[in-house]
Amino acid sequence: VEVAFVRNGKLVRVERVVPEGVEQELHALRELVQGPTRLERRQGIRTAIPEGARVRAISADGEVWLTSFSRSLLGMGAPETKVTRLAQIAATLAPLGDQEYASVATEGRLVTSLRLGMRPDVWRAETGENDYQYVVRGIQLRLWLLGYLDRTDVTGSLDYSTEQALVAFQGWEDLDRTGTVTGQTQIALSTAARPEPTAHRPGKRIEIYRDRGVLLMVDTGEVVRVVHTSTGAGGVTPVGAFRVYVKALMSWSVPFKVWMPYAAYFTGGIATHQSPDVPSYPASHGCVRLPEGEAERVYRFVDVGTPVVVR
């Protein structure tokens, strides 16, 4: 394998022999944190990885390397030094498989996510619970890879779209739905997988999980989007298998005297629709409330006849 170090401010690769029976990716990262040999140092090769850093875990999940290091990896150091550390990790992992991204955690808590083959962004970290750091853009990139956010919403700003994505993620993972980057959220993000639907069938379908407050958009057995939702208070949204029977860009609710944008009705007078109030608990009179932006996405996704499963 090749390990990425630094010489004269540029990344250089040095070869390491992988012992028999050891996974190449694990050995590569172990060699990375161990640093250059004495001979390599005499040749001007250095590393930005701090002495004493350790590899905790590495595994592959589809197109993503999931990595975890000791907390010291991103402890002391100037912002540019931390960017170089991440660049060394990315450059070491890039040749080892078909993965295009890497998530980087410390002690099992996600810090950031990287696009392999590209230099990491400027280090702008927030301080979370117990002083564990995280990079907002890296959190957003991870949420996008898991199906909770648009790629265009990876902006580095904790905005409304990111808050809704976090609530959806927390609901699916059975965490407190705060819409913020809690410690438990960092832990879950470090190893989470994209949600799986209940059935892998051809065509499009919608799955709604009342207790989790989550709607899954499923296309040919793959979850293409995970959306935060609020269903009926007291469990009044019926459980069962239904189909969309009518769509309306703007529907008027006669009993509640309110407009419901992007309504897709699937049983009785119950529909998915946009709402300005989508709390992290069941609060509606039976309909499936969706956040601004997500409601239109669901509306465009479904057709009359699209299956809707409520659980």
Briefly describe each language-model feature range.
Residues V1-G138:
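Bimodal "functional hotspot" detector
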Residues E129-R137, L141-A188:
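Short acidic, glycine/serine/threonine-rich helix-capping segments at coil-helix boundaries
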Residues L158, V167, G171-G235:
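Cell wall/extracellular polymer interaction/catalysis modules
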Residues R7, S59-G62, F69-L73, T106-G108, ...:
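A mature extracytoplasmic/lumenal domain signature
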Residues L39-R56, V83-I89, L189-K204, V227-T231, ...:
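N-terminal post-signal-peptidase region of extra-cytosolic proteins
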Residues L93-V104, A199-R201, G235-A241, V246-R311:
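Exported/periplasmic cell-wall-interacting domains
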